[in-house]
Amino acid sequence: LLLTTEHTWGLDEKTHFIEPELWDPKDFHCESARKFASSWRERRKFLKNAVLTLPNDKAAEAIRALNRLRPAEDLYLKRNVTHDLVFENKFFRIELNPSNATADTIYMKANRFRFKNSGLFTCEMFDRDDYERFRWQYLRLPEEWWAIHDFTKPDMPADAEKKRYEGFETNVHLTEWGHGKRITLVTNEHPLFRRIEIDYILPDEEDWLEIRLKWFGKVAHRLPHAAWFSLLPQKSKCSYRFRKLDEWIDPTDVVSRGGRTLHAIQDMVIDERVLVENLDSPLVAPGRMSLLDFTNKIPDMKGGVHFNLYNNIWGTNFPMWFGDNMTYRFRIRAFNQW
């Protein structure tokens, strides 16, 4: 398992994939692209190999746990809801907005905490201007060949456009079972995905709300892009604590040049009252989405928090295109454990 965290995660792009013309997904079937991508598959096999080293009973247990995380399309959604889009149990009340696939309100009854306009799914595409700004903000050697290739996209097409896809029209489906309900927002119309499902899971007797975002048929772009999931408290001035390596830090109290715009975290506490568990997406941007804007400003937390679900903005040894189906889980519950 330790091999999966090695810094050189696959072949180095600037050495093994010098292909300035190959940016369209249909081009990735050529020999050089297949060789390049094979190094990522090799690294992903480390997880499978780790499972195979376990005793049979433990291996079977691990396989079952991993399979539960595998995204599956819910093709049997039956009850379509078009009005009265307020759902609740004794712990939460949520009001959904199918016009942009968000929750207008997530209200926690135990502590009267409220989120607004939350659960927003955003995709953004970057252009050359983004990288030029970032190069001079971030690189200590901004004119070195290796640094330019590692941290920017010098060969990206000049006509690559900066775009943002924010929210989307959905259908709403309700599924009820003996001990709770699941409300699902669904679209098959997103320009970068064949299908997106966002589940709001409300068990009757559990004090948490789980939001589960699943995507299917993602376009495997080489062009730089990112996907985000956002939460925004209604209260404009909230305190935040991020848990990193089991230490709690304040995102507004980070040393100058200490990486104020992005954090890898285990979970977070908002306003000393709410625990947010980001079970599958450790990278979070406080205040605003920020990948290629290496500002040294203290983040304005009025903008909420934004979890990065995917990006391919760096060069070096990481997957430069990715089309897998994915699941991301977020749990929200009251917090009183200091």
Model regions: which residues?
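Residue-level signal for secondary-structure boundary sites
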Residues: W9, F193, H221, G315, ...
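Polysaccharide-binding surfaces and accessory modules of carbohydrate-active proteins
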Residues: A227-M289
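Catalytic and substrate-binding regions of extracellular carbohydrate-active enzymes
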Residues: L3-G217, F322-M326
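Acidic (Asp/Glu-rich), glycine- and aromatic
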Residues: F113, E205-E247, Q337-W338
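Short structured motifs
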Residues: G167-N171, T184-L185, R195-D199, T261-H263, ...
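Preference for bulky hydrophobic residues occupying beta-strand positions
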Residues: L185, Y200, F229-L231, F307, ...
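Beta-strand-rich recognition/accessory modules
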Residues: I270-W338
